[in-house]
Structure formats: C-alpha cells, structure tokens
C-alpha cells in the first residue's frame, strides 16, 4: 500500500511540474513583438482596447464589411480624439497587409501621444460611419 501511495504522489508531482520540452514551447512576447490585446464583433463601434503607446495594430476578418474604419482614443471628459482612418476593401487595393500569419492588418505608428489618464494607457476603439454589417477586429499592441 505504501508503494502504491508513492507511485500516486510521484505521478501527481510529474503532472504538476511542466516538463522542459513543454516550457520551451511556450512563446514569450517581448519588446518589439506584437502583444494580442483582444477582439470584438461590432457594427459601428468596437469595445475599448488598452495600449501602452508606440505602435498599435488592428486586423480585420475577411468577412468584415468593406469601407472606412477609424481609430479613436476615448476621452471620458472631452471629445474623443480621431487618430486616423483607413479604407478596407477586403485586402485588395487597400491599406491592410499581411503581418506574420495575420491577414488584413493595419499598423498605426507612433501613437504614444494618446496615452493619458491614471492608468497610463490609451483607450482605443475602432469605429465605422455606417452600419453595413458586423465586423470582427483583433487588436495588438
């Protein structure tokens, strides 16, 4: 019985401690790499995505409606700041490019001036002027 308990304890410990092969396969994001923030399905305005500054990237799903997409920085006590706009045409003749394995991405460069507030973050959201269907956006910082 004592030997059986030792085998069970050894098995539990082996399962709780990650192997070096598993640990080395985990990706560590560092400076100069894109950190995934999240995604949102939206019709005219996405949820807020928090950015620490530098560059900010959005990626649209190919099923997202064609048209103008705008990046805004939310200001709770004043008018929201329009960062920039970009036209999405489904990947043909627009300003969206493949970044790594992510198709239909646009990078907004040098947006650190929009970082504000007590959380020292910029609160970005993506907006569309017309509701022509549901868009799917992914955000990266």
Question: Where are the language model's segments positioned?
Answer:
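Sec-dependent N-terminal signal peptides of Gram-positive bacterial secreted proteins and lipoproteins
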Residues: 1-23
């Amino acid at each position: 019985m004592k030997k059986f308990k030792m085998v069970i304890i050894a098995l539990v410990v082996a399962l709780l401690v990650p192997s070096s092969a598993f640990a080395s396969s985990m990706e560590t994001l560092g400076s100069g790499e894109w950190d995934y923030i999240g995604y949102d399905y939206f019709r005219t305005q996405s949820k807020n995505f928090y950015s620490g500054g530098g560059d900010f990237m959005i990626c649209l799903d190919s099923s997202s409606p064609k048209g103008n997409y705008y990046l805004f920085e939310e200001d709770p006590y004043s008018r929201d700041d329009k960062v920039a706009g970009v036209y999405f045409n489904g990947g043909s003749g627009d300003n969206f490019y493949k970044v790594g394995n992510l198709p239909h991405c646009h990078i907004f460069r040098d947006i650190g001036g929009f970082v504000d507030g007590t959380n020292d973050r910029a609160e970005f959201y993506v907006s569309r002027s017309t509701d022509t269907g549901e868009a799917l956006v992914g955000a990266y910082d």
